[in-house]
């Protein structure tokens, strides 16, 4: 009999405003506001102030699922919510009349149920104050013709298809990037167990994504990234940014600068081990508490991902570390009795040149059932380590795309700021590390411990349940469904008093016509 675990998440809204501080620095600050719990709580995976030259954008921590910020787009500008994504280079917004589709006809195999069209529109677009992209009467809106479409499939199986457009991106209330290129997503495939995105702000380095033509033929192209476009317009000097999140859900995304007040101890710049992913070498994972210390030597790649909630460790390592912590296992979740958590207990991640990030076990608690605390450490069948949001709450990270370097430091929860703009290839305050793995074979696990480990015990938690969203919709394998152009036009005119105009209807009709011609709708 399957035992379900109920995980209680708080829903946190972060209010943001993009501020330009001059000469290439932009900044986004977080202000945390707590909202009632969502009816549906979703799990990402089952294993799974200011010198000149700085720019900033605000971010939101959504239910321990992902960070969001707002982009002000169009003339007049409208604010749209987007998830921060370190793994994808392209930025896109969901269209207000988004439709669900099944990409199986493209040879993409999916199983299980998915979010329906009605569910996507209700969840993503129902709030007028935080709606989806309307294709409204923006005087700066125009289509991109080569290529005209984009198609993205994420590693969690979320799949989106849409058109490439340009519009004005505003910041500091009066300045703008006039021809900001991004995508408008018209079709989405979202598994029922996943949380759909209202949009994505891609912060990965430039890499190819797909386009799909009228005959469903998929090709590739390299879209201009968000950071590349800011550099091209001399808003930033270099494609570089940093991220900080404290233990209360507040934080900032800082473009073109390092905030030296947000870390303590060493700030070490590590060479990326992957060209198209933010990954570095990790040398060991250590566990310590008030009575003992254990070290696990394992040289492998560690990926920084904001679209992941948990910290994923190779299975053997995950079980060994959690065993040392005294955790037990139930339905794939590691757990501890809440009243027995050692406040001195922590995981320490060691990177190159002995740089370390300490993550207290108490900050790994993702939910509680009675006296049982569930932990955000997940075993994975992969040999790599994935560092999700629970890691970012303890680390200040900086990414220099030109140098292919990632600098890390232990997060220091400080309300002040001390910004240093990036004016060359140098990372202010950082020690450059040139260490490369030599002593231990890749992914080999070697334990040194001050005590004898015991086996993990599996227990049954009879009073607990998993609250999992399940859609009743399972779309058949077919081509992306067509829009009803006539109905869209009627809706646009009927809603003219709510941000629509005759031009809105015309723009939407043009978008639909373009997609019909391309075979996308």
UniProtKB/Swiss-Prot annotation:
Keywords: Aspartyl protease, Cell wall, Endoplasmic reticulum, Glycoprotein, Hydrolase, Membrane, Protease, Secreted, Signal, Transmembrane, Transmembrane helix. The keyword Endoplasmic reticulum applies. Residues 1-17 form the signal peptide. One of its GO terms (biological process) is proteolysis. Its EC number is 3.4.23.-. One of its GO terms (cellular component) is perinuclear endoplasmic reticulum membrane. This is Aspartic proteinase yapsin-1. It comes from Schizosaccharomyces pombe (strain 972 / ATCC 24843) (Fission yeast).
């Amino acid at each position: 009999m399957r035992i379900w675990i109920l995980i209680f998440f708080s829903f946190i809204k972060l209010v943001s405003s993009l501020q330009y501080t001059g000469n290439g620095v932009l900044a986004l600050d977080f202000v945390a506001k707590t909202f009632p719990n969502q009816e549906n709580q979703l799990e990402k995976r089952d294993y799974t102030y200011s010198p000149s030259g700085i720019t900033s954008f605000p971010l939101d921590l959504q239910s321990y699922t992902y960070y969001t910020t707002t982009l002000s787009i169009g003339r007049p500008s409208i604010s749209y919510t987007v998830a921060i994504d370190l793994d994808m280079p392209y930025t896109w917004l969901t269209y207000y009349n988004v439709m669900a589709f099944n990409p199986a006809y493209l040879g993409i195999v999916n199983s299980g149920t998915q979010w329906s069209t009605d569910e996507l529109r209700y969840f993503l677009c129902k709030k007028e104050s935080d709606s989806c992209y309307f294709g409204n009467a923006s005087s700066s809106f125009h289509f991109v013709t080569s290529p005209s479409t984009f198609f993205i499939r994420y590693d969690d199986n979320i799949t989106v298809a849409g058109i490439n457009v340009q519009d004005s991106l505003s910041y500091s209330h009066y300045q703008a990037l006039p021809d900001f290129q991004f995508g408008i997503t018209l079709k989405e495939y979202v598994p029922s167990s996943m949380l759909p995105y209202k949009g994505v702000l891609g912060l990965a380095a430039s890499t190819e994504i797909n386009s799909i033509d009228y005959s469903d033929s998929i090709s590739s192209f390299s879209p201009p990234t968000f950071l590349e476009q800011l550099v091209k317009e001399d808003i930033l000097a270099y494609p570089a940014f940093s991220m900080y999140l404290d233990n209360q859900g507040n934080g900032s995304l800082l473009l073109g600068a390092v905030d030296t007040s947000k870390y303590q101890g060493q700030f070490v710049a590590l060479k990326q081990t992957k060209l198209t992913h933010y990954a570095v070498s990790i040398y060991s994972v250590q566990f310590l508490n008030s009575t003992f210390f254990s070290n696990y030597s394992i040289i492998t790649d560690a990926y920084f991902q904001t679209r992941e909630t948990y910290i994923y460790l190779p299975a053997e390592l995950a079980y060994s570390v959690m065993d040392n912590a005294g955790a037990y296992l139930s339905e794939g979740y590691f757990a501890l009795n809440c009243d027995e958590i050692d406040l001195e207990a922590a995981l320490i991640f060691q990177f190159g040149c002995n740089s370390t990030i300490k993550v207290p076990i108490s900050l790994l608690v993702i939910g509680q059932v009675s006296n049982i605390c569930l932990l955000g450490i997940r075993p994975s069948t992969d040999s790599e380590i994935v560092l999700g949001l629970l890691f970012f709450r303890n680390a200040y990270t900086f990414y220099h795309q030109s140098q292919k370097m990632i600098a890390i430091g232990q997060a220091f929860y400080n309300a002040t700021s001390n910004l240093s703009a990036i004016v060359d290839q140098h990372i202010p305050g950082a020690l450059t590390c040139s260490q490369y793995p030599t002593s231990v074979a890749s992914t080999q696990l070697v334990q040194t411990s001050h005590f004898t480990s015991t086996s993990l015990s599996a227990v049954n938690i009879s009073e607990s349940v998993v609250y999992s969203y399940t859609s009743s919709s399972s779309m058949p394998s077919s081509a992306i469904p067509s829009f009803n152009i006539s109905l869209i036009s009627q809706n646009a005119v009927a809603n003219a008093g709510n941000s629509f105009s005759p031009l809105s209807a015309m723009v939407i009709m043009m978008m639909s016509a373009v997609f019909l011609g391309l075979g996308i709708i």
